[in-house]
Amino acid sequence: MNRLCAAVLLFAVLFCLPRSAGAGEPLAVVSETELARIVHEGDGRPLVLVYWASWCVPCRHFREKLEKIRAVYPESELRMLAVSLDRDPGPAMAYLARSPLPYPARIGDAELIKARSGMPVPTTILYRRDESVERELVGDVSEKRLGHYVGRIVRR
């Protein structure tokens, strides 16, 4: 009975609640395979990929820095994607409904969350135009440091 209730609740959370994801896109669940496809479909634009969680206080501080990056570099120059590692998608969806991002967001599926279970949040991976990794930043890094590395991937 508990599994049935959990399944119904998950369905309601994933398909019935408002699904604001930032940048006008619906919030979707993303798998390892889908995330790899997103990383490699860059059409020559670099990517800032940030892993976060709704319960993570440093993620909320870091988000402000990412919003400033978006203000400097429009989508036409820089792709940005936030992937929630919340095991329960409800809090992440509620957080994004209250405070939408200016760039797309996704909820990691169980496989992706399990694969990243030891990863600290926030973790930001900066991909160059050729889809290779420029830098991995862990934690709430300074605005200056973030801006420096993002500038490098945009200019290359």
Protein language model annotation of sequence segments:
Residues P26-L47:
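A short beta-strand-turn-helix
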Residues A7-C16:
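Bacterial N-terminal signal peptides
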Residues A21-G24:
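Boundary at the C-terminal end of the N-terminal hydrophobic targeting segment
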Residues V48-L49, M80, T124:
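Hydrophobic beta-strand anchors of alpha/beta hydrolase catalytic cores
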Residues Y51-K68:
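Conserved redox-active cysteine motifs that mediate thiol-disulfide chemistry
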Residues A97-L101, I107-G151:
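Thiol/disulfide oxidoreductase modules built on the thioredoxin-like
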Residues H61-E64, A71-G108:
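Conserved segment of the thioredoxin-like fold in thiol-based oxidoreductases
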Residues R45-L47, Y51-W55, P120:
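Short pre-active-site segment immediately N-terminal to redox-active cysteine/selenocysteine motifs
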